[in-house]
C-alpha cells in the first residue's frame, strides 16, 4: 500500500510513521509513505496557495491551481490512485471503509487548511470524501492520519497478530468487550471472577454479553443497527 499525503505541513504527519506498528510496516515494505506540498506546484509569487473567498466570508481558502497541478501530477504518475479529501462536510469514516480501502494499492489524502479547499477541486478530483467526526480541526492532517492508521492495520502483515482484528470494536457491529490484565485486584477493584477460572467457552459467552451491554449503553445508535436475531438472543 502506498500512502501519499498532499499537505502544507509534512512535519505534522511524518513523525507518526517513525514508531511502533506503522514504523515496522514501513520497514517491512507493507506500506510506503510519501508527501507532496502544494506550494511546490503554485504559480503564485512567494509560494502562495491561499486566497480570500469570492462572495465574502471569514478566512482564506486553498486556491484551486496549486492543488489541481499537484493532483494532476500524482494522477499522471499513477492513474489508479484513489484520491480522498478530508472535510467536516462529508460522511463519517468507519471500520467498513477502513477494511474496504485496505484493498487499494495507492491512496492519496488531500489535507485542507485555512477555511478549507475550493469546492471545484473536490468535485474535479475526489474519489471519496470523509470526515472523522462532528467537530472542526485546524487542518486535514489529523483526520488523514486517522484514516491511514485504520486502513493500514487492515493490510495483511501489518499487525503481528491477525486475530487482533477479529475481536476489535465494530468488527461484528459491537463495541469490544472490556479487557483486564494483572494484578487481579487493583486499588480495591477486582477482575471479573469468571475471567480467572480458565473456562474459555464461558469467557467468550461472558465477553459477548458484556460487548452487547457496552454497545447498548455507549452507542445505542449502533445497537439499533444490530440484526434483530442477535439482539433477541442477547436480551433473553
Swiss-Prot record:
Q: Which residues bind S-adenosyl-L-methionine?
A: 112, 132-137
Keyword tRNA processing listed? The answer is: yes
Q: What is one term from the GO cellular component aspect held by the record?
A: cytosol
Does the record's keyword annotation contain Magnesium?
no
Record localization: Cytoplasm
Q: What broad class describes the main subcellular location of this protein?
A: cytoplasm
Which reaction is recorded as catalysed by this protein?
guanosine(37) in tRNA + S-adenosyl-L-methionine = N(1)-methylguanosine(37) in tRNA + S-adenosyl-L-homocysteine + H(+)
Q: Which SUPFAM superfamilies match?
A: alpha/beta knot (SSF75217)
- Report the EC code(s) recorded for this entry: 2.1.1.228
- What keyword terms does UniProt attach to this protein? Cytoplasm, Methyltransferase, S-adenosyl-L-methionine, Transferase, tRNA processing
| One GO molecular-function entry | tRNA (guanine(37)-N1)-methyltransferase activity
Question: Which example biological process does GO assign this protein?
Answer: tRNA N1-guanine methylation
Q: Which family does it belong to?
A: Belongs to the RNA methyltransferase TrmD family.
Oligomeric and partner information: Homodimer.
User: So what does this one do?
Assistant: Specifically methylates guanosine-37 in various tRNAs.
| Protein name according to UniProt | tRNA (guanine-N(1)-)-methyltransferase
The organism's taxonomy opens as: Bacteria, Pseudomonadati, Campylobacterota, Epsilonproteobacteria, Campylobacterales
